[in-house]
């Protein structure tokens, strides 16, 4: 979102610049100086020249420095200005709001920007306490008051932070930059779950009943060719969670992903879960029937509360959840997809009466103990069709002229069952064989929803909660929901 950050003195001298896009050159700073700083008539906090936009503010402290961002996309201006004011506050905490101090300790600001914007220019962490906790150098005084260090000690009283007789700050030598990702910070779990970093969960939450609801939502997308071969198939999934937990709980669960099952830490946790009985997600009764073996997860994206360092090392998902509902992660699966339905269409053209004859078989492939709801098969017909003679073994089917389709519906469809449809179209009197031959034959599409069935085979193998302030045992629920995305069959 942000391509670069510039800091000017009150006179218009460029003091600091940091670019996140290689396409930017240092000469771009001259454009802002000429168009805004040297132009007293400009009062707008945003300037757009072609595809380049400058957002700027004046620092409210010290030498009233110019803080400027450069963007080359349709960025959110409100978010950028909020970032600039947060940057101003952090710089003030480090007494870097004066030109001379900024020139001497400019690398401190570079580290701030690495933490606040990451490596791609997108604001990821702008909370003052959280940013300071991740900095390699701590400020001695924060806006005229005392600033507590992450370990709870007063930084001002520490002998490791030297000050001169004039009261000016002298920072120790800059060592190394920390990771630009907030979620991967720290070498220990306790460092990641520092209360200063948990900005998404208030302190002191109390619930009469501790509960966790985990939802594995999947949408299967598939395209079947005329000969029955699968042209493409993949699953887009999300794991949503609703928590009502007291205190500051640390939740941890494992999946049967192929990399995670090879982790030694994962094996230890699974063995521990198998030794304990009770209503846990590790219980086989909570595993969907379609799941088997391991699953290769791709393109995983996580909520900010998840410890990426833990996932990258051991493929264990560990987090302090916000109170309420949220989307915990997204994932993508392409291999070993479990198909819930098989559609076998036989569509022929009768040259004698200009009719289209349909013989369609719909078979459910999920276990017989399960059932699907809201099953809808959308069967296209030629635009010249005025009616259809339909016969079905089960369900309800009708011709919908405004959609040029037959709609076959089932309120409930049991597993391992098969139903058939036979239909003949009735065309208008002026319909010719050429019209029917030129018909593009749009694919048949299917809609459905199956509970406790996993299209990808993904399984939550265990779920544990620690650090909970409540004395009551948390009740944990899990639900697998499989739906159709783009489920199409050619004929």
UniProtKB/Swiss-Prot annotation:
InterPro entries tied to this protein: Adaptor_comp_med_subunit, AP2_Mu_C_sf, AP2_Mu_N, Clathrin_mu, Longin-like_dom_sf, MHD, Mu2_C
PROSITE patterns on file: MHD
Keywords, ordered alphabetically: Coated pit, Cytoplasmic vesicle, Endocytosis, Membrane, Phosphoprotein, Protein transport, Transport
Stretches assigned to the MHD domain: 209-490
Gene Ontology, cellular component aspect: AP-2 adaptor complex; cytoplasmic vesicle; cytosol
Protein localization: Membrane, Clathrin-coated pit; Cytoplasmic vesicle, Clathrin-coated vesicle membrane
GO terms for MF: clathrin adaptor activity
Gene3D superfamilies: 3.30.450.60, Mu homology domain, subdomain B
Predominant location: membrane
Pfam short name (any one): Adap_comp_sub
Entry-annotated residues carrying Phosphoserine: 179-181
Any one GO biological process: clathrin-dependent endocytosis
Keyword Phosphoprotein: yes
Note: Present with 3410 molecules/cell in log phase SD medium.
Summary of subunit composition and partner proteins: Adaptor protein complex 2 (AP-2) is a heterotetramer composed of two large adaptins (alpha-type subunit APL3 and beta-type subunit APL1), a medium chain (mu-type subunit APM4) and a small adaptin (sigma-type subunit APS2).
Function, as annotated: Component of the adaptor complexes which link clathrin to receptors in coated vesicles. Clathrin-associated protein complexes are believed to interact with the cytoplasmic tails of membrane proteins, leading to their selection and concentration.
Family: Belongs to the adaptor complexes medium subunit family.
Name used for this protein in its record: AP-2 complex subunit mu
Organism: Saccharomyces cerevisiae (strain ATCC 204508 / S288c)
Gene name for this UniProt entry: APM4
